[in-house]
């Protein structure tokens, strides 16, 4: 498929890939299981890949597994496991199994041949497929830890929801990841030890901002990834804050019926909080959710439009906060790509 410039990949959360030798399932340590992994070969979106196939046909998935377990995890936290895979031969089914010593197996099934999400065990919170082009799929599953030891197993059943396998099945596998979080982040390659990607920040210095005490406009678009954990601010698109009573920001809420609801706010120390709110489920929790909005912040109004829908203006503000000497952070609490961020000192 043709390359498309999606913008800047920005991930405000630090993540650690606990899978060692994440791109080599024959790695000298870490990997266990009877499935047969081939030689590491150049040629995938992550640079290299291997073949993976069951070592024998059977009525259980023992011959069709490669796994790493015994990882230190936090009970009650959410973890996501994933792999970038491609169909090669046979049935084309693939499983991400979120292993936890208190719950044993938690399987999510994927049809690589047809690019279709299959069934999942009850304790899997969510699972999905992200299209990387040319038949490559990032297959992921999330679950809550119930112990302090766990990991992930990558398996090859010969149908949806079954525990049998066929030695004739072959897939290509390019990378694996097991990380704390509700959704998959970008690939963190590892060698003999786990690797961490630091949290990222995007800051515009105050000197470079077109601050105006009367009116300003902001436009932003891109794709975001988030899960519904039931909090008021799942995503914070931008944050321009002097203190708790002087700020401008934009969030996506995800609690009760407000899941996916965009909120555009401003507050001056002399006045109450003023906001304009979009519809619930405007942005449903998922991976790579497109967004596009524009907002007008004024001394006597705040208004916005998102996804082509003009929201009702709020005309109760009496002043804009004085942020003339304050840096602005965009993508403050954000996982995804930012296509554009534009700001100007006009209504």
Predicted regions and their residues:
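Flexible glycine/proline-rich, aromatic-decorated loop/lid segments
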Residues: 311, 315
């Amino acid at each position: 498929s043709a390359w498309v410039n999606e913008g800047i990949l920005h991930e405000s959360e630090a993540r650690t890939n606990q899978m060692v030798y994440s791109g080599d399932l024959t790695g000298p340590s870490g990997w266990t299981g009877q499935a047969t992994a081939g030689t590491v070969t150049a040629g995938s979106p992550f640079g290299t890949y291997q073949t993976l196939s069951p070592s024998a046909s059977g009525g259980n998935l023992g011959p069709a597994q490669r796994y790493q377990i015994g990882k230190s995890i936090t009970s009650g936290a959410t973890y996501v496991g994933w792999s970038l895979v491609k169909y090669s031969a046979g049935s084309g089914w693939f499983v991400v199994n979120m292993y936890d010593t208190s719950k044993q197996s938690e399987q999510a099934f994927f049809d690589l041949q047809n690019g279709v999400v299959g069934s999942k065990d009850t304790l899997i919170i969510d699972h999905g497929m992200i299209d990387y082009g040319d038949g490559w799929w990032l297959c992921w599953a999330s679950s809550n830890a119930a112990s302090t030891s766990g990991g992930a197993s990558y398996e090859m059943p010969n149908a949806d929801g079954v525990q049998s396998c066929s030695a004739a099945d072959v897939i290509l596998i390019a990378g694996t990841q097991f990380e704390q979080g509700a959704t998959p982040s970008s690939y963190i390659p590892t060698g003999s030890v786990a690797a961490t990607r630091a949290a990222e920040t995007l800051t515009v210095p105050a000197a470079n901002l077109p601050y105006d005490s009367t009116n300003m406009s902001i436009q932003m678009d891109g794709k975001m990834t988030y899960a519904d954990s039931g909090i008021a601010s799942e995503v914070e698109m931008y944050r321009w804050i002097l203190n708790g009573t002087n700020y401008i920001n934009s969030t996506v809420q995800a609690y009760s019926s407000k899941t996916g609801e965009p909120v555009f706010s401003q507050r001056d120390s002399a006045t109450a909080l003023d906001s304009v709110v979009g519809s619930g489920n405007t942005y449903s929790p998922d991976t790579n959710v497109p967004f596009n909005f524009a907002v007008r912040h004024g001394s006597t109004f705040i208004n916005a439009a998102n996804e082509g829908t003009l929201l009702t203006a709020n005309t109760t503000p009496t002043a804009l906060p004085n942020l003339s000497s304050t840096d602005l952070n965009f993508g403050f609490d954000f996982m995804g790509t930012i296509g554009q961020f534009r700001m100007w000192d006009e209504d």
